[in-house]
Amino acid sequence: GSIPACGESCFKGKCYTPGCSCSKYPLCAKN
């Protein structure tokens, strides 16, 4: 389990950091 490279969690199914997605829900990860 590697740590996603985005410093945020999913919020209402979205990630607001550019280039990040909710693919590692509940954490955001690089697309």
Swiss-Prot record:
Record flagged with keyword DNA-binding: no
A GO biological-process term: killing of cells of another organism
PROSITE patterns, sorted: CYCLOTIDE
Cystines in this chain: C6-C20, C10-C22, C15-C28
Keyword field: Cytolysis, Disulfide bond, Hemolysis, Knottin, Plant defense
Tissue specificity comment: Expressed in leaves and petioles but not in petals, roots and runners (at protein level).
Residues that span the membrane, as ranges: none
Cross-linked residues, Cyclopeptide (Gly-Asn): G1-N31
Function: Probably participates in a plant defense mechanism. Has hemolytic activity.
Name of the protein described by the UniProt record: Cycloviolacin-O14
Organism: Viola odorata
